[in-house]
């Protein structure tokens, strides 16, 4: 049996608003550790991974791993019936064919209950390899949203370039060209110092030998989180022999019909966390919204992406004040938002043949 209670329904509403344009049907994988969703869009150009930790719920119980196949548009409609500050409880029995949602009002004795039909969705277990990136940009999510929305008015693609100068977003359109440069500030380094320490890029640090002025450079590689997915930016979009997914290039994927079914996230098993206090529903508690821009890089990176997808990703700014862009040449872009109850990550294959 599954029972998950959230302090506010607003969290689920914002999550669904962030991903419903990318994924139509998906499995929510529930286990003792929490609730996860992982699926690719129909063109196999983008992948979305959502993690809701068990400790982020006011109450959480999951007796055994179970997938909940839902149509995201239908779930969005059911969630619209709840007020943002309603206490939301999700229930499902073993082998159930319905998902029960209970909304409890904080200001009155009103209790609303909805039963939503579940779907049988074919899913595969994904192999998720560790990935290292050459550059990481940490910035206010509101700034990222503004940039991609502004540039989408002029063109269909954006070139994101990370260099010693800063991070540049450039787009070319029929009527006009645009370029936005964000430089790193010292204030940002301090404010983002502890943000995403487990997600560091590979870099170099100088180690001075004792008794000598000679410096030896050594490469520092920090293991990525298990959710980071390594995808080939050239061709593919299907499982390889080891069960790992590779994204198709943005150019190729946009030409396909939207008839692919999304895939679920790999299940994990961990100790139950029932009864632990829930984290409040709010934006990122790790960094302020006006933190400026922090850039960590090992080498120059320049890639081109579809603005249509980035605009969709930016809807997650409602969940977090801060966004991280992780990049390496010829590797899909990772856009990560962290919030009190977990995180949401997007992977987008770069366009091929564009400067």
Spell out what each predicted region is:
Residues 1-20, 25-152, 159-355:
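DNA polymerase sliding clamps and clamp-related checkpoint/processivity subunits
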């Amino acid at each position: 049996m599954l029972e998950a209670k959230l302090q506010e329904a607003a969290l689920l509403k914002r999550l669904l608003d962030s991903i419903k344009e990318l994924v139509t049907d998906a499995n929510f994988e529930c286990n003792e550790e929490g609730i996860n969703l992982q699926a690719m869009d129909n063109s196999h150009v983008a992948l979305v991974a959502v993690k809701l930790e068990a400790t982020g719920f006011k109450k959480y119980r999951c007796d055994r791993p179970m997938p909940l196949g839902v149509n995201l548009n239908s779930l969005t409609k059911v969630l619209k019936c709840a007020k943002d500050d309603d206490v939301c409880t999700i229930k499902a029995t073993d082998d159930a064919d319905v998902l029960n949602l209970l909304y409890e009002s904080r200001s009155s004795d009103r209790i609303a209950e909805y039963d939503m039909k579940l779907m049988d969705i074919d899913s595969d277990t994904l192999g998720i390899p560790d990935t290292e990136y050459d550059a990481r940009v940490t910035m206010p999510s509101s700034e990222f949203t503004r940039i991609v929305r502004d540039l989408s008015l002029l063109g269909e693609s954006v070139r994101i370039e990370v260099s010693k100068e800063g991070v540049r977003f450039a787009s070319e359109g029929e009527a006009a060209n645009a370029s936005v440069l964000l430089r790193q500030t010292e204030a940002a380094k301090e404010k983002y110092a502890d943000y995403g320490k487990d997600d560091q890029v590979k870099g170099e640090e100088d180690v001075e030998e004792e008794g000598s002025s000679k410096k030896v450079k050594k490469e520092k590689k920090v293991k990525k989180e298990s959710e980071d997915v390594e995808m080939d930016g050239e061709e593919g979009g299907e499982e390889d022999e080891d069960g790992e997914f590779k994204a198709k290039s943005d150019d190729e994927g946009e030409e396909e019909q939207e008839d692919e079914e999304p895939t679920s996230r790999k299940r994990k098993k961990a100790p139950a966390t029932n009864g632990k206090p829930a984290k409040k529903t709010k934006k990122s508690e790790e960094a302020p919204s006006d933190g400026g821009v922090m850039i960590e890089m090992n080498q120059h990176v320049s890639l081109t992406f579809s603005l249509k997808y980035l605009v969709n990703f930016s809807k997650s700014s409602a969940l977090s004040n801060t966004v991280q862009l992780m990049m390496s040449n010829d590797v899909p872009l990772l856009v990560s938002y962290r919030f009190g109850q977990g995180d949401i990550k997007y992977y987008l294959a770069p366009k091929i043949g564009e400067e």
